[in-house]
Amino acid sequence: MKPSIYGLTRDELIAWAIDNGQKAFRATQIWDWLYRKRIQSFDEMTNISKEFLAILKDSFCINPLKQRVAQESADGTVKYLFELPDGMLIETVLMRQHYGQSVCVTTQVGCNIGCTFCASGLIKKQRDLNSGEITAQIMMVQNYFDQRGQDERVSHVVVMGIGEPFDNYQNVMTFLRTINDDHGLAIGARHITVSTSGLAHKIREFANEGVQVNLAVSLHAPNNELRSSIMRINRSFPLDKLFSAIEYYIETTNRRVTFEYIMLNKVNDGVEQAQELADLTKRIRKLSYVNLIPYNPVSEHDQYSRSPKERVAAFYDILKKNGVNCVVRQEHGTDIDAACGQLRSNTMKKDRQKAAAART
């Protein structure tokens, strides 16, 4: 399968064009066709010579994704299941916010982080997505708007879908540069958030990139014993290593870090844990923020359930009394396969059942 041209940054596309005997402005024209006019076929590039179009077609495809499923929620959230060229499945989510249209992208096929409450890890990591496959998710959603004549654009991006973004670091960084490019989609860096489960060395590397992209850390527990029991990654990067990296990030960038905290009933949502969390984040209070997330139950993880509103409220109150900036996250798509990885997992089950039925 040819690589997607979406996998190149503008500078890389210019270098490729020059290597193929073209002037730099040809690459700029191609970039404009891809991201401003958002064409679906190289043949639509009317100011590119037939000879160079032939080279383009021989070298690249445009969009490598095929839509398998689109579930639309009553609140306007759309959950997509896309098929990759090798038949693997990934999820992408469009969330309609009051401040714009936000898209959550996937960075890996499956996940090896091993969080015990998460649907994404039900299927182990098969491979990384390349940068073109990540960018194509944004283009698929933008095409959804364009084809309906909707004067809307993808304005915000969260890299929080299936997989650990920092375990696919270079492809994610290429993706970020592509969607942020002022000559293309021009999605503002401060409108982009990358979430990590806590790869401390990559947080340090990200701090040194000099980008204005937001960082979120999936914390979910305020002490090592509890965090290691629900997030295997904590055994490799315990809280002292993680917070050392976070403090380095804050000192280097002077940017705020968001902590994501899924509320699991009678697991991590007690008043003791709330106080521990307040104490844990005390040193970085001015540049940190806690996002309390209602849990979307997963049938394969039936040992967990959603925290009742009263426990969430008590947890929230303790954080606020300790001066912690925090919010309970607004839910989206609760009437569809809402948990990350759930649509993919359910579709794969159905595919297996159909295949088994066909053999009998």
Swiss-Prot record:
The primary site where this protein sits is cytoplasm
Cofactor dependence is on: [4Fe-4S] cluster
Radical SAM core domain boundaries: 97-335
According to the record, the segments passing through the membrane are none
Q: Where in the chain are disulfide-linked cysteines found?
A: 104-340
GO cellular component, alphabetical, reads: cytoplasm
Q: List residues binding S-adenosyl-L-methionine.
A: 163-164, 195, 218-220, 296
- What NCBIfam families does the database record attribute to this sequence? rRNA_mod_RlmN
Q: What does this protein do?
A: Specifically methylates position 2 of adenine 2503 in 23S rRNA and position 2 of adenine 37 in tRNAs.
Name of the featured protein: Probable dual-specificity RNA methyltransferase RlmN
Species in which this protein is naturally found: Streptococcus equi subsp. zooepidemicus (strain MGCS10565)
